Amino acid sequence: METYSHAFFTWALAKHGVKAGRAAGIAGAAGATVPDLPSFAGTAYYVGTAYLWEGWSSMHSEELLDEIYFHGPFGATGSALHSAMPVVALLLVYWVFGLGRRDRRRILLWFLLGWFGHTIADFLTHVDDTRPLLWPIWDWEWSSPVSYYNRLYYGREFFIVSHGLMLLIISWLLLKRIVGQKRRRTLLPDRSVKRPPA
């Protein structure tokens, strides 16, 4: 999935789904971006500002894409962050040491859940750009039958469904806010009407 999709769905789930709060929603969205940070840094390092003007066409070779996403310092770090092992280890530390007692607003928990959710979603939506899910313990990779971008593997359909769902959630949240504001106005006394003196 696109990085912004990971962040949006985690934010929506944390803040509006399970009602963990605003801070948890922001932390979840931040955690959901963590696995892709090395690819952003690699793109900035290898391609620079050309990416801003030319987009994907600025990445003119497979070797360049491999350096950004799979090899070298950026690719290796990205593979480590896309593995479930580091985040599962941190979730175990959170649970074993009872960090939930100190994390009352669940900020750290949602950060880790956002990261974990990104890892699982990418595992399920990557076909030809897979990473080992259990690295460094096991180098096994799975090629999903569905791609988040490749049209040969339902990428267009996935894009329509995921972005349609984001649009639906945004519309629902806006409608909920508008209805809530109207209700508050009807429940509050109108202060503009002057009452006659008693």
Predicted regions and their residues:
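N-terminal membrane-targeting hydrophobic helices
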Residues: 1-198
